[in-house]
């Protein structure tokens, strides 16, 4: 994390001095993907997945080849990133759950009892990058996945340096992209989706795994990433006259494998037919696992392009610093196939795929 701390320090020195005029402060957008491998982008050697918008950012910017994650799994990696602390000093060091609260793994129970959601919280008064940016005069927003404090705790975004939040509070909820609710600040926003436990929902008994119709129940009405993106663009609209810090913690491309149909169809046409994923390695089944994984990344790349277009439209692009990375490297379950995509890139070894970016 020395590289990360150095970068943040330079940004503070160069852009956040209290003697600067407000208009001269750069907007800062930090994009954090979830379980995306070093080799999943074209600009890092990917041959199958198309990422033209992210590549364009790289071509006009700096490629970081030694920008390492602080931990190989989600919550501690995010804790290290937000606090700048080494994992040995970080408050959160694993994806541990607070089982003493009750039926935390029941999505039906979480729907009724919000106190069963979420993970171990950051402590009150923790110096996070969000709080640091607030102290420097920035309006701060976090959009996507949190996982650093259950609802009502001291670890929620609003108590950790973020003026606005929209997305998933709980990592377990983020294992489906069609959740029954999301969070807007400290309020639940209920969606037009049924409760589908991503770890228990399987193909119906006797269903044909090669028939697309067998998978229809895994696609619902409101795709969380669309809603998160819309709220994020609204945040830019609201704060375009003042410096803002935007932390975009998308849950993509973490499994379950779920993507907009138009992008899945694009890659089915490109890759051809393939063996379905029936759920034998956890998470929800998927008729076209390779096509869907690629679709999730290209869909997000499309969103990055739309965000850049918005910044240019509002005259903000030239005064905005955009940083793009992943919380850790590629996963191995849920139908993902890191070897097929060469997702680990340079970090492949005889012992497996390095979870770093």
Task: Give the ranges of each region predicted by the language model.
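Formylglycine-dependent sulfatase
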Residues: 2-7, 11, 19-357
């Amino acid at each position: 994390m020395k590289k990360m701390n150095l970068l943040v320090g330079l940004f503070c020195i160069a852009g956040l001095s209290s003697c600067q005029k407000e208009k001269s402060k750069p907007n800062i957008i930090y994009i954090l993907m979830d379980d995306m491998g070093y080799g999943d982008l074209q600009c890092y050697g990917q041959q199958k997945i198309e990422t033209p918008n992210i590549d364009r950012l790289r071509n006009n910017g700096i490629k970081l080849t030694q920008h390492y994650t602080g931990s190989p799994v989600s919550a501690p990696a995010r804790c290290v990133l937000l606090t700048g602390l080494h994992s040995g000093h970080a408050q959160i060091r694993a994806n541990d759950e607070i089982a003493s609260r009750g039926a935390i793994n029941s999505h039906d129970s979480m729907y009724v009892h919000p106190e069963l959601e979420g993970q171990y919280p950051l402590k009150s008064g923790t110096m996070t990058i969000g709080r640091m940016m607030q102290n420097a005069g920035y309006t701060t927003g976090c959009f996507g996945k949190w996982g650093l404090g259950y609802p009502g705790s001291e670890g929620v975004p609003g108590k950790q340096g973020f003026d606005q939040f929209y997305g998933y509070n709980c990592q377990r909820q983020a294992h489906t992209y069609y959740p029954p609710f999301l969070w807007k600040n400290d309020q639940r926003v209920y969606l037009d989706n049924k409760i589908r436990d991503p770890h228990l929902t399987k193909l119906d008994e006797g269903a044909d795994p090669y028939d697309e119709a067998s998978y229809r129940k895994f696609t619902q009405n409101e795709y969380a990433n669309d809603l998160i993106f819309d709220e994020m663009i609204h945040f830019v609209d609201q704060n375009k006259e003042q410096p803002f810090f935007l932390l975009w913690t998308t849950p993509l491309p973490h499994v379950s494998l779920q993507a907009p149909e138009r992008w899945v169809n694009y890659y089915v046409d490109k890759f051809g037919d393939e063996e379905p994923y029936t759920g034998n390695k956890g998470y929800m089944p998927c008729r076209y696992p390779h096509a869907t994984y690629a679709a999730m990344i290209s869909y997000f790349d499309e969103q990055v392009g739309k965000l850049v277009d918005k910044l240019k439209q509002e005259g903000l692009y030239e005064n905005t610093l955009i940083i793009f990375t992943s919380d850790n490297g590629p996963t191995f379950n849920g139908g993902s196939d890191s070897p097929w995509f060469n997702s680990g890139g340079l970090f492949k070894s005889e012992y497996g795929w390095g979870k770093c970016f």
